[in-house]
């Protein structure tokens, strides 16, 4: 997910340098080898995705739910056997591949996963956050 409006950060934070690369490149690295698509309102993010060979959908729709819907509309016809989908905001630079894989493994091990929503939680408070998998 890369459809933020950059109101609080002042510029497109996904393009801000993090570890000598645009922040969004961390999400690309964590999701390497997975079926993925970036949904964005930003032409600059679109250009970065195209440069990196990442499928991208550019849109101008107003709601966060539009991002989810567009992503699913892209992925489901291409991967009909998909049993779940991770929604990963592009501004999660500390998310590791191991954490993402552990989340996917837990989801796949859940017998009732069709009715489950998996979210990472802040360890001390248990406050749910991103990414989300359902």
Spans of model-derived segments:
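N-terminal glycine-rich phosphate-binding loop and ensuing alpha1 helix
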Residues: 1-43
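Generic hydrophobic secondary-structure packing signal
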Residues: 23, 45, 63-67
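Hydrophobic anchor at the start of a short beta-strand
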Residues: 35-36, 54-56, 85
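Conserved beta-strand termini and adjacent loop/short-helix elements that scaffold enzyme active sites
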Residues: 39-41, 57-59, 120-123
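Short loop/helix-cap segments at secondary-structure boundaries that form the rim of catalytic
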Residues: 46-52
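Conserved donor nucleotide-binding strand/loop of the catalytic core
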Residues: 53-65
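Conserved beta-loop-beta/alpha segment of the NTase-like Rossmann-fold superfamily
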Residues: 64-133
